[in-house]
Amino acid sequence: MLTKTALAVILFVFCLAPVAVTSGQSRAPITGEWRIEFNKKNADEVQLSMSRGQKQSWSNNIKISEIQGLSANYANAAAEVTLRIVHDAGTFDLVGSFRDGKGAGKFRLTPNEGFFSALAARGYSNLSEDQIFGAAMSDLKISAIDELKAAGYDQLTFNNLMESAIFKINAASIADLRSVGFDHLPFNKLVEGSIFKVDSNYVRETESLGFTKLPFEKLVEMRVHKITPEYINQVRQMGFNDLNLDRLVELKIFNVTPEFLNEMRAAGFTSITPKQLVNLRIFKIDGDYVRKAKSEDPNITVEKLVEQKIFEKHPGRGIQ
């Protein structure tokens, strides 16, 4: 099974062909080019990329053990290779060579007719060559489709099935979210949750910090902006104990850190609010700027300081 990576790592382009392979026809082999690069951070994985000219490309990390004939020795040796990847939807045969930890060559995908007959029986027939390739690359499984149907997701498009395979949306992940109150989320929300790792553990962690009964969209937003329990505790240690989620997100977006807070306090703003800190960050006001302004006007406020900065950048917008 392919390992899940961040969305930026997965490149999966569907350019659906106008001519589909009907369920009664034998599916011809599909060919293209492959590239493999050994992962310097994880010796058990490689970066596998497959492409079919300009039509489709796919890239992801995959365990070495999932590629028959691949050896970790190829990371440091030159060799001609014959490799194989067996998935439910078909078998990839790869030929090529390795040099300096990088491999490249040609592949040939032989579709599994039994798999596509079972897929057609579930309503997914007349698939294009690109969709056949997609099913094999994502390691789509009939058992996973049946699990989704049993969980109430029985009206999924073929592209939804691809997403379920890529982002590991299955009975277990659905049950995990249901255990914390998110019952029968729309499928696109399941995808978002999987991409940004919103699971029962994260929900319980946020609840333990006082953020209870948050809508699923807010939990995703927290993950997008990396609002972790550690970050929440960091903000509270800065003396801001009762901030709502929107204010936390603002602080994170504009990089309001304990160091920045201490810099502002040392420059003379000993009592400063989160909103004021955000405004200072927005207008790129640092400790040196504050000290210079306070040397000219010891009683200057944050608001006046921001107005002064705006006026310096846009003289025509002077304070009326």
Residue map of PLM features:
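A general sequence property marking short-to-moderate contiguous segments
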Residues: L2, A20-V21
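General marker for long, soluble alpha-helical cores
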Residues: V21-Q320
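Bacterial N-terminal signal peptides that target proteins for export
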Residues: M1-A8
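Bacterial N-terminal signal peptides
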Residues: A8-P18
